[in-house]
Regions:
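A generic local secondary-structure boundary/capping motif
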Residues: 52-54, 86-95, 109-116, 138-140, ...
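Extended, compositionally biased flexible segments
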Residues: 2-99, 211
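Catalytic-pocket segment enriched in acidic/His residues
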Residues: 5-7, 13, 17, 21, ...
Length: 235
């Protein structure tokens, strides 16, 4: 099942299930926020082409990881949705962009052993995480606004054999990234409560460097593709 967050005509964000109908994608709209409690189908159905997709979750916390216990915290203002702009800060030489997986938490998670982690997961999404290339400190280089693209939606059925692709060429299995995410969720929960909608992301070692405007794209098999437009920030 694919869970999307979207807006129609710039209205308030809504949630829905992405479904196939007569060869095209439609959204079966939900009656509320699935991270805030039980929801039902509202009965409304909209064509995917008629909405603007947003980041599929609105996290209070985003932990990004390169390896087990090697992670950093990004604020919610970093996150944006598909086809939005990844910013090159005006104080940087450019940005390094890496694809990855984002694991979305479904229930409050504290002191959770690895064997129980999957019970607290809603699903997986695709990310494009950017790091500024500058002489500033690590926090500045990773936590700046609009530095993390998330989407296109959350896939609740996680396939460990799915492949993650950066652009059109660099492809890898997500199996090791997923193992790392599960271990980090358990470890993070030992000192910080993870709440519904929070995300633990693991980045690939594949990367692209942008010093000029361009386009970044990643894809996870069975989930979907995520595209971002890279633009330099105007001071």
């Amino acid at each position: 099942m694919k869970v999307a967050r979207f807006t129609k005509d710039e209205d308030l964000p809504e949630y829905g299930f992405v479904q196939e109908e007569k060869g095209k994608k439609i959204i079966a709209v939900l009656s509320g926020n699935p991270f805030a409690g039980d929801v039902d189908l509202s009965g409304e159905r909209v064509d995917l082409s008629e909405v603007r997709l947003l980041a599929p979750n609105f996290p209070l916390k985003i932990f990004c990881c390169d390896d087990f216990m090697d992670f950093y915290l990004k604020p919610a203002t970093c996150a944006m949705g598909p086809d939005d702009v990844l910013s090159i800060p005006d104080w940087s030489r450019g940005i390094e962009v890496r694809p990855g997986i984002g694991i979305i938490i479904s229930t409050p998670t504290r002191n959770c052993p690895i064997s129980e982690v999957e019970k607290h997961i809603l699903g997986m999404t695709c990310i494009l995480d950017s790091t500024a290339l500058s002489d500033r400190n690590h926090v500045c280089n990773t936590a700046f606004d609009d530095s993390l693209a998330v989407g296109p939606w959350i896939e609740t059925k996680i396939d460990p054999d799915a492949r993650l692709t950066l652009g059109k060429e660099k492809s890898e299995s997500i199996r090791n990234l997923l193992k790392c995410a599960l271990k980090n969720i358990s470890f993070i929960s030992s000192f910080s409560t993870l709440l519904p909608g929070d995300m633990v992301a693991v980045r690939s070692q594949n990367k692209q460097i942008f010093e000029l405007p361009g386009e970044a794209m990643a894809k996870i098999g069975g989930v979907g593709y995520l595209r971002s437009f890279v633009r330099r920030e105007v001071p």
